[in-house]
Amino acid sequence: MATTIPFDFRSHCVQLLAQAVKQVLPEETEIHIELQRPKQMDHGDYSTNLAMKLAKRLRRNPLELAKVLIGALPDSPYVGKTVVAGGGFVNFFLKKTAKQQFLLTVLQAADSFGHSKLGAGKTIQIEFVSANPTGPLHVGHGRGAAFGASLANIMAAAGYAVTREFYVNDAGRQMDILALSTWLRYLDLCGIALPFPSNAYQGRYVVDMALEIHRIHGDRYAHYSDSPTQQLAEINAKAAADGEDEYLDNLITAAKSILGEDYAYLHNFVLTEQLNDCRNDLMEFGVEFENWFSEQSLFDSGMVARAVQLLDDKKLLYRQDGALWFQSTGFGDEKDRVVQRENGQYTYFASDIAYHLSKYERGFDYMLNIWGADHHGYISRVKGAIEALSLDSDKLEIALVQFAVLYRDGNKISMSTRSGEFVTLRQLRQEVGNDAARFFYVLRKSDQHLDFDLDLAKSQSNDNPVYYVQYAHARICSVLEQWGGAVDIFGRAETELLTNPAELVLLQKIIDFPDTIEAAAKEHAPHLIAFFLRELASEFHSYYNSTRFLIPDEALKIARLALISAVCQVLSKGLSLLGVTSPRKM
């Protein structure tokens, strides 16, 4: 009767070690066993420094303890031998037959191969992108989108129940600035030319929204009993005496006064236009969310007032200069923070406290915020507020994503969001394609700067990592198409014929795939999947260039085709986790 091969050899070896420790060191009831993949294949398949760690604590010789542990290891149908190496490492060597037979398990598992029960069904909310709906998404947002979407896929594959959330900043000053910017462009279309503030939104999309409003409503929002020309001219006349922010705020106040109830229409129009554009852009990029959470809803529901009241009930607020301050220095922040201004308006920080209170009250087991690196200073105050509310701050993690710098012809492309001089995510996607954008964005750790070479991303060469990986997939599909047989036969493949060193390397890479997904989930590191795919593609291309597949020896042919079919399956799964397609032809 055939033995069922476990999906996870690593876990099997960990269990063997745990049983050995229980036998020879029964007093060691709390141990953490880690296995690493040795850098050199001749050092085994897995290695652990457990004996060295235990020896240090128990004041024993690590080499002797390693030998004792090996002697206590139960027999295994999958482990060929274990040896002591170096200063006390225990190295495991899997049986060649175990690796060969594992291939059949991979093929049988199909798309579920690589999945694990790491998350055990626990819920995790991943909030990412959350860009202000004040203009098109730019390439910086694109990196956060690719990172967040890929990580969400990886966490789901690792057994977590994932909720993807976009926090819509639809309340506050930035939306007012966009509404004002659009109205001023609209007035210009109506023949009312007024100075346009340098710190208003400058992009072409503002003019486009003004044109759409004018197309629908004509001059309706230009003629009021209170003349826009007179009021705004008075504000412009003393603009030099005011600071830029005060000048802009005065214009916003005047716009609200002049437009009256019509201001709400203008505000909602620009919000809807930009939010729809954002949704469509992300959807085309393969990034979707279960929930779009409105900041304004926190005010409408009274959640902001309730969050502030909870802090007040804990006597953690005080008044100074007419404003209400949170004693955040008592919770690790560098200074106390205002939650309510002198004019009674709540600050952005107050709504952020309420938003995180909402997350906790929704009952997620874990929460992950993915923020731009420019929000680094915001972490301590948010964590402080969570602790002040007596919530478990360990449930919340915050990952930072550095900006992506674009290069064309070796030259850096300069960008400025407010002035409208930036490359949008849509422009990037149109130039290099979704696949290249998604893959390139996760080639580095999220907290590392990313240099995005547009020319490389468009090239069809082995230097282009996404092309290199996709080409491996297409090559395999081509071989299988030339063969033209039924893949069901692979389940009866004589895998013991796969003895070529290149074949054993490919088998080992396939075995590593579930471990790679788990590591990427634990470390919040999609780049580990990208690295793995490049390595697997490289090993396959070498194998392809040195091996014939459609050969007279039927048994060996089927075994080799089964192997590359499994490689194809893993490449496709890995690419899908990163939101990248797997073309059958290139």
Curated annotation (Swiss-Prot):
Chief location category: cytoplasm
* Encoding gene, per UniProt annotation: argS
* InterPro entries recorded: aa-tRNA-synth_I_CS (IPR001412), Arg-tRNA-ligase (IPR001278), Arg-tRNA-synth_N (IPR005148), Arg-tRNA-synth_N_sf (IPR036695), ArgRS_core (IPR035684), DALR_anticod-bd (IPR008909), Rossmann-like_a/b/a_fold (IPR014729), tRNAsynth_Ia_anticodon-bd (IPR009080)
Q: Which GO terms describe its biological process?
A: arginyl-tRNA aminoacylation
Does the record bear Flavoprotein in its keywords? Answer: no
Task: Report one GO cellular component.
Answer: cytoplasm
| A molecular function (GO) term | arginine-tRNA ligase activity
Localization recorded for this chain is:
Cytoplasm
UniProtKB keywords: Aminoacyl-tRNA synthetase, ATP-binding, Cytoplasm, Ligase, Nucleotide-binding, Protein biosynthesis
Subunit info here reads: Monomer.
Question: Could you tell me the EC number(s) of this protein?
Answer: 6.1.1.19
Q: What is this protein called?
A: Arginine--tRNA ligase
**Family of this protein:** Belongs to the class-I aminoacyl-tRNA synthetase family.
Sequence motif: 'HIGH' region, positions: 131-141
